[in-house]
Amino acid sequence: RQQIFPVDPDAWNTVSNAMQKVISSPLGTAIHFGKNTHYTVAGKTGTVQMYAKRRFHYRSSKSIPKALKNNHLFISFAPIKHPTIALAIVVEHGEDADGIARHIIDRYLQLHQSNSERKAA
């Protein structure tokens, strides 16, 4: 496989191990993503804050206008050792970017496996 730009193997291992823990550690921000997966995956969650709750005096998230709700992000790749898919999901003023990614990766890997099995037959 051709490498587009050089990456220090130690740096790559540090980053990919940290991204695995986002999904596999009980303290990971995407722990629910990794439940019942049949593949290894690494990911990173992110939030872009659109408002300061105190500044606008909102008492609950439900009272915040949609245009001021946070943007949610999730980047991931799978399988970890030999990735065949990498993606970034951005949900404007919403949630569940990691849930969307899970559906996409599940389906992609299911189709990829089916195609591989057909080629082998």
Task: State where each predicted segment sits.
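Active-site beta-strand/loop architecture of penicillin-binding DD-peptidases
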Residues: R1-I4, D10, S16-N115
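Short, highly charged C-terminal tails/helix-capping segments
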Residues: E117-A121
